[in-house]
């Protein structure tokens, strides 16, 4: 097997993980910003704002783990040798 294919798989896996990490960081930041803004506007609604925040953060992180699964598929399913 050509080493270029293995190198391409590793580079592609790294790009997948980098994109997922950047996306998760941006998504968590936007959700956190919305939470802080909502609590600053209405402090009494703090309890009602935490549930959608944690659901949103969980979905954003789930998307990151889906990226992790695709990275593992691309890197480890590449035939070597």
Swiss-Prot record:
Sites marked Reversibly protonated during proton transport: 61
Keyword Glycosyltransferase among UniProt keywords: no
SUPFAM superfamilies (UniProt xref): F1F0 ATP synthase subunit C
PROSITE patterns, sorted: ATPASE_C
Family: Belongs to the ATPase C chain family.
Stated role: F(1)F(0) ATP synthase produces ATP from ADP in the presence of a proton or sodium gradient. F-type ATPases consist of two structural domains, F(1) containing the extramembraneous catalytic core and F(0) containing the membrane proton channel, linked together by a central stalk and a peripheral stalk. During catalysis, ATP synthesis in the catalytic domain of F(1) is coupled via a rotary mechanism of the central stalk subunits to proton translocation. Key component of the F(0) channel; it plays a direct role in translocation across the membrane. A homomeric c-ring of between 10-14 subunits forms the central stalk rotor element with the F(1) delta and epsilon subunits.
UniProt protein name: ATP synthase subunit c
Species assigned in the record: Mycolicibacterium gilvum (strain PYR-GCK)
Lineage per the UniProt record: Bacteria, Bacillati, Actinomycetota, Actinomycetes, Mycobacteriales
């Amino acid at each position: 097997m050509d080493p270029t294919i293995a190198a391409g798989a590793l580079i592609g896996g790294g790009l997948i993980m980098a994109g997922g990490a950047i996306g998760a960081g941006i998504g968590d930041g936007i959700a956190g910003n919305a939470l802080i803004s909502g609590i600053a506007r209405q402090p009494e609604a703090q309890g009602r704002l935490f549930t959608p925040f944690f659901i949103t953060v969980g979905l954003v992180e789930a998307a990151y783990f889906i990226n992790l699964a695709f990275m593992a598929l691309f890197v480890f399913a590449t035939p070597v040798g």
